[in-house]
Regions:
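A Zn2+-metalloprotease active-site environment signal
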Residues: 9, 27-345
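Sec-dependent N-terminal signal peptides
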Residues: 1-29, 251
Length: 345
């Protein structure tokens, strides 16, 4: 559409809203000792020797209730999770990628990126491993934004951005993977594309109402519809967030990660943000999740066939985090020296 470039910034904001992911899940009360193992898909890295230490599981007591097709990790890639009418109206995969690429171009113009290959290759490898074990039908491009703000977002078509602040906030690789799996699930389920389709339908409805009402009353109706209703779709619905939780937990499990780590990461970030408001981005913490959403997500994980071992962390994660900290400290030292020079000059 001709007016898409003008609305690109708004769309980027809409697509990037993490919408409650911080409070997506609560940590389970059950803890059992567990030995971690190297994720087999990460063995392709010539420089990575995964070093793991025992940490407690976070999944609750096992359940024998049968899994539905959309709940079963064994059905990943074999099922259709986009069967709704809105998804069908949202167009082809090619259209999704095209729209995402245009929005990503705006992000690329405005953001500053981490270019250190050790960091970018590691984050890309973790993300691509999850994509490989997901329902996504588009290729993913993953970049690390040089920002201390805790955030991550994925645009339609698989254009995925992870902030440096998120890497620093995670205590292990599984926690990072939990956030990435949730975002990959939003793309796999086409949530942002569906949001845009809903917004377009509302625009058409508002236009029709303005024609029907006519004159100034119609113009007022059109303007309020555009401001109020479109704002509703600049964030994911509770249903979309719950679906991303459940799909993301399946993707973590399939990729070899402890699915409970998603709970610990989001709960940790929520607690830190309560102690220090602004710790995470406003978009990242838009909607606190109710306890039943947390419980249902972890209850689903308890119904998966139990792995003897899960990946929790790796020596490479620790090296990447240490390097990010060194880069951040060096920058802070340089900035302080410049400020001191300015003050004394």
């Amino acid at each position: 559409m001709n007016n898409f470039p003008r609305a690109t910034t708004a769309l980027v904001f809409a697509f990037s809203l993490f919408s409650g992911s911080v409070a997506a899940i609560a940590q389970s009360t059950k803890s059992t000792d567990q030995t971690q193992t190297t994720n087999s898909t990460q063995a392709d890295s010539k420089t990575t020797a995964t070093s793991q230490a025992s940490q407690p599981k976070t999944t609750p007591a096992r359940s024998t209730r049968p899994l539905s097709t959309n709940e079963d990790p064994a059905m990943i890639g074999k099922r259709n999770i986009n069967g709704g009418i809105i998804s069908k109206m949202s167009g082809s995969t090619e259209k999704e990628v095209r729209q995402g690429r245009e929005a990503a171009a705006e992000v690329d113009r405005q953001a500053k990126f981490i270019e250190d290959p050790m960091i970018t290759e590691y984050v890309n490898r973790v993300g691509q491993n999850i994509v490989l074990h997901s329902d996504a039908k588009v290729p993913f491009t993953i970049n690390v934004i040089d920002s201390d703000e805790v955030n991550a977002f994925a645009l339609p078509g698989g254009f995925f951005y992870v902030n440096k602040g998120l890497l620093l906030a995670a205590d292990n690789e599984a926690e990072l993977a939990g956030v990435m799996a949730h975002e990959i699930a939003h793309v796999a389920a086409r949530h942002a594309v569906e949001n845009q389709t809903k917004a377009s339908l509302l625009e058409y409805a508002a236009l029709g109402a303005s024609i029907f009402l006519g004159g100034i009353p119609g113009m007022i109706y059109q303007n309020t519809a555009g401001i109020g209703l479109l704002g509703i779709f600049m964030k994911f619905s509770r249903g979309a967030e719950e679906e991303a939780d459940k799909l993301g937990i399946q993707y973590m499990y399939a990729a070899g990660y402890d699915p409970g780590a998603m709970a610990t990461m989001f709960e940790k970030l929520e607690a830190k943000n309560k102690k220090k408001p602004g710790f995470i981005s406003r978009a990242f913490a838009t909607h606190p999740a109710p306890p039943d959403r947390r419980a249902s997500a972890l209850a689903l994980a308890a119904r998966f066939p139990e792995h003897e071992e899960y990946v929790i962390s790796s020596s490479e994660f620790q090296r990447v985090k240490a390097k990010l900290l060194r880069l951040s400290n060096a920058r802070a030292t340089t900035a302080g020296a410049i400020q001191t020079s300015d003050d004394t000059g």
